[in-house]
Amino acid sequence: MKTLFVIKLVVLISALLWKSCAGNLYCDIYEDELPSSCKDILAKYPGTPSGNYDIQPVSYGPTITVYCDMENKRCGSKGWTAIARVDMSLPGSQCPGNLHLITDSESGIRSCGADPNSIGCAFAEFLTHGIEYTEVCGMLRGYQVGSPDAFGPYVNDQGNPESFVDGVIISHGTTPDFIWIYANGAEKVPSSSSNIVCPCTGPLYNGVVPPYVGTDYYCDSGVVSDPQGGVFYPTPLWTGTGCNPPDFCCSASGLPWFSKKLPLPTTDYITLEVCHNELPENTPLDQIQLYIR
């Protein structure tokens, strides 16, 4: 009788283990521990397709389900763990963090931006769940409202760390350490010398890119010339199209994707801020994708 009980118990445990592992491409890892990231999964199982997987970023910590992009050639490598995948065109989509929902009445485009009634930045923090990473990759799609000033605020408001660009700031940690900037200039073709257009629009640009930004930025405008206050321009920004030579920061290779290698490994959360220093201007986003590796 005792032997029969043991056999039944073994069968029951086996059935439960099989049920928990059904459809899991790395079930045998359960005998030891779950992988800590999508990169870890790919290292153990080359050829694993993109999809949702369970990982355990911290040993003996909680298990979380993440989306793994295993074939993202736009980031220059594989095995990326998604920390943000926002598409406001999908039904039921909501703006992350304290980004404000902005709906254009004419185009119907739903997007997430800064507070339309207050200057400054609105932000969203994306957790990395303890995953150690040295690379960040992602893409944004945004739109121009009114006449944003690109890096004009840095020239006009130096000394204010929260007011150096109209557009989007991606950073990590509390310092913060900047990862990438998506700047939004007033117009593609300025008619006179200006510091509120993109730095690479040509000899008429007389502004300054903050030294701590370096070359880790894109810049674009949603209107050719003469932007009007408060108008939502439905032409997507940072697509690499409609640029005018020598507008290299508008037509840079890889747009709208960026990829950045960090100097040191970190587990910091990543912050995305949409900023504007005047009303009525904004740079709302309808697509946000951020990955770490």
Regions found by a protein language model. Name each.
Residues 2-293:
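Mature extracellular or lumenal effector domains of secreted proteins
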